[in-house]
């Protein structure tokens, strides 16, 4: 009889799925044990797991196991519940999400946060705005193109340095109608995740010439990561910063390119708005950008479609011959309103052969934009033909 009772107890425990309920992989249990041992809300989180529908419970368990301690201690459980429900709904609804490996879905679709922004209820809102727009798409690429193209109009948010803060949440950006490149990237990542497209935040603390930082978005498509940004470039992996990214330095905390991960990686993302923080996990993806730019430059040279354009910045027309006459200035390049590149000109102490150069498409008109010595926006129109070109610009 005792043996029979033990067998019945074991069967009942198996049916219930252990201490956290059915549907949770056995490998998650030690992770949950460790996570819940270190939070005052352990009982509430255990109850949340047991109350979560069985087909959503593994996703909830994964988030609780890996969420930052601060979120585990304070984040709204209703918000966590809604996030999991709509992420799992997207996986059931969209064929591209259903086809994802579990590891990609869990780390690049399911998470409720991108970096260290305020945790708000973005997923349901963005799902309801965007799901009807991608309902007719059969492939991830088409859904990605749709969301990337229409998002600025759908949410009414534009780039503006007057935004309240750098690391804005979607709700904060939509309330103001503006965001920095960081806020725009957070918004695009969340918009893509809302309709089941795997996405993550990427960026660098400083370009190779130290003229500033930048953030953008990576998307997982056809088994590989590619980059885009809030204002959709003409193709994946062809944004205006490609040449700069191609000169990033792997392993250099300031000049490498990192992509964020919700799951711990052993490395961290250098957030310029919170320089002491080590809380956001990341991977160094610099080499992929270097390889992408080298392939682009090699193809352009082989096909003869692009030409090198060098830009020198001098004090004025009377002082434009000696190394000491040169001025270091940030310059952006546009064609038909779309940014094609940017960089910083060589200053007076740099070698005379060190010249800011761009690889630009032939037979096109370009606008070079910079601030002069008086802080005024200056624009220089340059007609690029078939031959390499050196352009001189002046601060006065």
Where would I find each of the regions flagged by the language model?
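Secondary-structure boundary elements
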Residues: 43-47, 51-176, 212, 266
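Structured interaction patches on ligand/partner-binding surfaces of diverse proteins
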Residues: 371-396
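A eukaryotic "domain-start" boundary segment
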Residues: 20-39, 43-47
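C-terminal motif of bacterial Sec signal peptides marking the signal peptidase cleavage site
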Residues: 14-15
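His-Asp-centered catalytic microenvironments across diverse enzyme cores
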Residues: 160-161, 194, 205-210, 215, ...
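Sec-dependent N-terminal signal peptides
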Residues: 6-9
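Positively charged n-region of N-terminal signal peptides that target proteins for export
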Residues: 1-4
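Cysteine-centered nucleophilic/redox motifs
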Residues: 177-202, 217
């Amino acid at each position: 009889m005792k043996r029979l009772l033990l067998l019945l107890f074991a069967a009942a425990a198996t049916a219930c799925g252990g201490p956290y309920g059915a549907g949770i992989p056995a490998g998650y249990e030690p992770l949950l044990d460790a996570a819940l041992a270190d939070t005052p809300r352990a009982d509430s989180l255990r109850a949340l797991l047991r109350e979560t529908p069985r087909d959503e419970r593994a996703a909830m368990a994964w988030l609780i196991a890996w969420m930052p301690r601060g979120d585990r201690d304070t984040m709204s459980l209703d918000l966590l519940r809604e996030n999991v429900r709509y992420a799992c709904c997207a996986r059931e609804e969209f064929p591209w999400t259903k086809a994802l490996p579990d590891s990609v879905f869990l780390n690049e679709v399911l998470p409720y946060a991108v970096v260290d922004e305020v945790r708000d209820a973005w997923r349901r809102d963005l799902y309801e705005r965007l799901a009807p727009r991608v309902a007719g798409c059969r492939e991830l690429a088409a859904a990605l193109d749709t969301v990337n193209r229409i998002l600025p109009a759908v949410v009414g948010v534009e780039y503006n340095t007057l935004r309240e803060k750098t690391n804005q949440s979607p709700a904060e950006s939509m309330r103001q109608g503006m965001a920095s490149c960081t806020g725009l990237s957070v918004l695009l990542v969340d918009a893509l995740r809302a309709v089941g497209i795997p996405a993550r935040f990427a960026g660098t603390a400083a370009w190779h010439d130290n003229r500033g930082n930048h953030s953008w978005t990576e998307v997982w498509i056809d088994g590989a990561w590619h980059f885009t940004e809030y204002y959709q470039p003409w193709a994946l992996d062809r944004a205006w910063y490609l040449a700069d990214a191609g000169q990033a330095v792997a392993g250099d905390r300031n000049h490498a390119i990192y992509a964020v991960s919700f799951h711990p990686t052993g490395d961290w993302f250098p957030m310029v708005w919170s320089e002491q923080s080590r809380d956001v996990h990341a991977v160094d993806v610099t080499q992929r950008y270097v390889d992408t730019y080298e392939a682009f430059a090699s193809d352009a040279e082989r096909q003869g479609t692009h030409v090198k354009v060098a830009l020198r910045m001098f004090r004025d027309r009377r002082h434009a011959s000696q190394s000491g006459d040169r001025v270091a200035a940030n310059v952006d390049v546009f064609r038909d309103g779309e940014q094609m590149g940017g960089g910083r000109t060589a200053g007076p102490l740099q070698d005379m052969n060190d010249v800011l150069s761009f690889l630009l498409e032939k037979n096109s008109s370009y606008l070079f934009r910079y601030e002069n010595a008086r802080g005024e926006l200056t624009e220089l129109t340059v007609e690029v033909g078939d031959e390499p070109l050196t352009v001189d610009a002046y601060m006065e």
